């Protein structure tokens, strides 16, 4: 055993129960290798691992050096939003569909992870967004997002009107179905589907992508990640929401503004040594192949 990662957490809730076999295989293999292993409590209960050391996501973030997320991108997003608060590295084994954030192939995960545990890996920091919904002198509702923060109508799709301020300076007003505010990580997710640009992960930039704007002149906007975005609403005829990674919703009420900024802490991602962002674009999203 080496000292790159001594305590390893196993997390993630795959859509298909059969994928839980990966968790058990991983748990037994890591124990046999001499690592201290913490497995997420709910997973241990489902697998009936009565002798396993268990913990919540927060406890794993506090105690482990590396978290292995087993599942798809949704599992990675949900776990990583919590784990990013702590000094822990994160890597994923893909048991979902696309697996853009989960690098390890389930059929070869043990060997790939063994190489990582021996110190053969790439470390990368990805920044998150923090969204605040607040009114003057009122308590804030706060959440974070790894991919994107989306302004949209509540339950029924319709046009909404809002103003966008960047660093407290008016930028533009819009009448549209909403607005996608994306990190470089999220630029290949919902933002891409709406016509937004692809940003390489190392860029300190945020994209603002309109959703079906009722104008001929609206275009995606790329700004520095150090900027603070403020959304204002003058005529709220119906409920609006802020959605974080399509997993957490924050309702917006009359008289409230939305503030979106770069989060104070990053996500520490671990990739295999042969990881290439552009190879991932090609294999997962059909990016152009090499000609020669």
Swiss-Prot record:
Its main location: cytoplasm. The active site is at 73 (proton acceptor). Its EC number is 2.7.1.23. Its cofactor is a divalent metal cation. One of its GO terms (biological process) is NADP biosynthetic process. Keywords: ATP-binding, Cytoplasm, Kinase, NAD, NADP, Nucleotide-binding, Transferase. It catalyses: NAD(+) + ATP = ADP + NADP(+) + H(+). GO terms for molecular function: ATP binding; metal ion binding; NAD binding; NAD+ kinase activity. It holds the Pfam family NAD_kinase_C. NAD(+) binds at residues 73-74, 147-148, 158, 175, 177, 188-193, 247. GO terms for cellular component: cytoplasm. It comes from the Bacteria. HAMAP family: NAD_kinase (MF_00361). Involved in the regulation of the intracellular balance of NAD and NADP, and is a key enzyme in the biosynthesis of NADP. Catalyzes specifically the phosphorylation on 2'-hydroxyl of the adenosine moiety of NAD to yield NADP. NCBIfam families: PRK01231.1, PRK03378.1. Belongs to the NAD kinase family. This is NAD kinase.
